[in-house]
Amino acid sequence: MDYAKTIVNELGQTLSSISERNTENLIDMIEGADRVFLAGCGRSGLMVRGFAMRLMHMGKKVFVVGETTTPSINQQDLLIIASGSGETGSLVAMANKCKKIGASLATVTIFPQATIGKLANCVVIIDAPTAKSQQKTAITSIQPMGSLFEQSLLLYFDSII
């Protein structure tokens, strides 16, 4: 049970470090978009699917990129990419296409200076260290791989509904 308490404390630290200004900007972008498209790979992709469902329940037109019924994005739309690294190849390609079309782009990431972060109109940083990150942070994690980022992503998305 101590392990679970430690994880809950990690999540509290991580979520409390997220910028309120950037969160408000993301909410404004969601509210202002005709349609919202969501993308993520692996476990981050699972978290965006949950967020898509919540947005749909609120009456927003929302699509998960890669599903068979997802239409093409246009200039009045918003693409939100969840990527811890900000460098996942397929997600970078989506970000580039989004910018080429003229749609808005937001990302939730650990690394704001990564390729997707540099392309985005809005960057929400989740300061969740991973084994791959070389950055020094006040937040540490006992969890493997990107677990803290992925868990924080789920809670963050639920908190902005």
Residue ranges of predicted features:
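Short, compositionally biased "basic patch" segments
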Residues: 1-4, 41-45
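Generic N-terminal amphipathic, Lys/Arg-enriched alpha-helix
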Residues: 1-17
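Hydrophobic packing residues in well-ordered alpha-helices of helical domains and bundles
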Residues: 4, 23-26, 48
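A short alpha-helix capping/helix-coil boundary motif
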Residues: 4-6, 28-33, 72-75, 92-93
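A short N-terminal beta->alpha junction/helix N-cap motif
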Residues: 14-18, 39-42
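A short, well-structured juxtamembrane/interface segment
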Residues: 17-32
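Glycine-rich phosphate-binding loops that contact phosphosugars or nucleotide phosphates
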Residues: 37-41, 47-155, 161
